[in-house]
Amino acid sequence: LSNKRNDGYGGDRQGRMRFPLEVAEAVRAAWPKDKPLFVRISSVDGIDGGWEMDDSVALAHELKARGVDVIDCSSGGNSPKGATNANLTRGPGYQVPFAERVKREVDIKTMAVGLIREPDLAEQILQDGRADLIAVGRQALVDPFWALHAAQHFDIDPDFEKWPHQYAWWLEKWDKGL
């Protein structure tokens, strides 16, 4: 859709994968071996002629072979009119099947995204083994304390002593109702 190149970085799937694979190799070479390397992919473009799940599975295999540890599976965003034009039905967890398929077919850790707003949905995705991590980007804009609220929802002690002091002192007061 946007890659109209006809050199080694365009054309067929291998050409279109070349640049992200070279970047992954360079980052892995510079990044400490004991730290995980995440790569976010647009699993599908959601429009005719665009990137599809088979392409993403192939890319994930190649990324894993180059030392990537986690594939963050998003979608859309490469349409001339933006992500909102992608032919994807949106709803809570609508992109989770992308992470699930990559996890299953590539045997690599995945991160699920896509309107995961409620702690119960996030936990169910993890418990069902559909993904290994959950991203709550836009929801964190609405509720910057989403992780704390999720812990409280599940009656988990937030143990503020383990939090950075600049956050812990206030959150502990807030948690106790000031």
Located regions from the model:
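Flavin-dependent oxidoreductase catalytic cores
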Residues: 1-178
